Regions:
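Active-site catalytic motif of lipid deacylating hydrolases and related acyltransferases
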Residues: 2-63
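Conserved alpha/beta-hydrolase "acid-adjacent" motif
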Residues: 16, 137-143
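Short glycine-rich catalytic loops that host catalytic nucleophiles or stabilize transition states
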Residues: 37-41, 157-163
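Catalytic histidine-centered segment of alpha/beta-hydrolase-like enzymes
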Residues: 45-46, 162-174
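Catalytic active-site module of serine/aspartate enzymes centered on a nucleophile-bearing elbow/loop
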Residues: 58, 169-181
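Gly/Ala-rich beta-loop-alpha elbow adjacent to hydrolase catalytic centers
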Residues: 69-79
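A conserved short beta-strand
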Residues: 88-101
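Short beta-strand/loop motif that positions the catalytic acidic residue
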Residues: 124, 129-132, 136
Length: 181
């Protein structure tokens, strides 16, 4: 059985909000797949040192061939850890509505900032799929375009509707996960 890890977003109540995504996604995956949804220390308070420690340990402990689904600031945190040298043995990384934390972006003045040459710091050959809603009310879909420019190997999909929490049908995500797990 493939290990599935869902990394929640950042800010107040992000874990609670993202639990809705997990609760809608889990039944679509079938009985053989279970999403692990730990509360990552530091994400809700946007404390990079705490996030780096807790999420770094969580990623390190994943079994080979795991799939990570990460949302919003949690997705950016996973990307930053990978850029800093974390090397979990992932089968696939799914990023949902992540802010682009480059030093040249609106999200860049934080401890979560990426190196300018982001793609050069990521694990070679790691399949990455990024989904963003065109009507995201929190993180503009223009962030997805930044990722596409900085990580051209990643598949970038702009979805019509659903907002930041991907309200509505999640079959697209379930099918993609089942296709790689």
């Amino acid at each position: 059985m493939t290990a599935l890890l869902f990394v929640h977003g950042g800010g107040d109540d992000a874990y609670r909000y993202d639990k809705d995504i997990v609760d809608r996604l889990q039944p679509l995956l079938g009985a053989g797949m279970r999403i692990d949804f730990p509360r990552i220390v530091g994400l809700e308070g946007l404390d990079w040192d705490a996030v780096a420690h807790d999420l770094g340990n969580t990623l390190r402990d994943l079994p080979q061939g795991s799939v990570v689904i990460a949302h919003s600031v949690g997705a950016s945190a996973v990307v930053k850890l990978l850029a800093e040298g974390a090397r979990p043995r992932l089968a696939h990384l799914f990023l949902l509505a992540p802010p682009y934390n480059g030093t040249d972006s609106e999200w860049g003045d934080t401890d979560f900032a990426f190196p300018a040459d982001l793609a050069a710091h990521l694990p070679r050959g790691l399949p990455i799929t990024l989904y963003h809603s065109d009507d995201d009310e929190i993180i503009s879909a223009s962030n997805a375009k930044r990722y596409a420019a900085k990580i051209p190997e990643a598949e970038t999909v702009i979805r019509h509707g659903g907002g930041h929490q991907f309200r509505g049908d999640l079959h697209f995500l379930a099918e993609a996960i089942m296709g790689v797990a």
